[in-house]
Each structure stands twice: as structure tokens, then as C-alpha cells.
Amino acid sequence: RFGCSQPRGEEKTTTEGVGSEQRCERSPDAIVPESAVVSADPVPDDRILENALATVYEYTDKDLGDAVDGTNRQILRRRLLYLACMAPVPNDVPQVRLRHDRVSYGDLCHYGWNVWNAFKGATNRFYDQTELAEWLKASFESLAKYNTKTLRAKLRATDGGYRIRLIDNLKEYIQK
């Protein structure tokens, strides 16, 4: 589900005009250029989910900003879009590669929990924590070696010194 689907034949799965400065109406984030949004990408189905996605993007920039370069930031935003819309991530979306192991696997689990919590609050239906752990494993190259049960157990762990803390309200957190 989180990186194992094949696009349908009629779907466009490549980006054209990379480097275009135009903005895309389909992107809930005005910063993402049209070239980064593929026509087959899902679209949030309501304003509440769009707002949650924008909040998650800001949170990602705040807490993971120094750990991802521009390319990996776009990859992560695309993966977050699929997560928010509860859509399978196409195989052509690569995993996110972090810089120099600046973020521990426990921190990524906390990051995932915070993102999940924001999306869960924006919709009546959302993935369970095991599915979130699967998404984390499929999304981050550094988590591929861990099993899903281990990642799920770390989602709300408080047993160590984590740089990324658990946050109940992302909107309030990013405004600080």
C-alpha cells in the first residue's frame, strides 16, 4: 500500500518541465511547483484535510528541515500527500534519504506519530498505528531495516532522549 502499487496505464507518472516556476492549483502547498505534482497524485477531498496537510508541511520543515535536502523534501511532501489522502504510494516515488543520520529512528517514529495525529484529527477515518509504522518503513530509507512491530512500539516511546517530542497540537507547536 505504501510503495507497492502500480500506476494505471492512463495515469501520468513522470514530471514534465522540472524547474518550472509555475504553481499548481492541485498542490495544497503553494511552495510546491507544478512540476513536483504529478497528474496522478491524489487531491485532498476537503478544506480541513488541506489545512492539516499544510500544517504537516510546516511542521516537517521545522523539525526535519536540516535533515532533508530540497529533493528529499519534495519526495517527503509527496509521500505525505498520499498518506493524508489514504492512497497507495506509486512505486516510482523513492524513499526519503536523510542527511548524515541526523534523526534517530525513535525521532522518526515520533515525527510519524505527530503527523498521524494531525491527519487523524482532520478526518473521521484514518490508518491505524500499524499501518503508520508500515508507511514510515516504506517512506524513510533509514527505517527500512526495522520491522513494523519495532517501529510501532516506538511511536509514543518516552524511554530515551529524543530530539523530536510528541505533540498533541501541531498547529500550536508551529506557531511558537
Regions found by a protein language model. Give the residues of each.
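Flexible coil/loop and intrinsically disordered linker positions at secondary-structure junctions
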Residues: 8-176
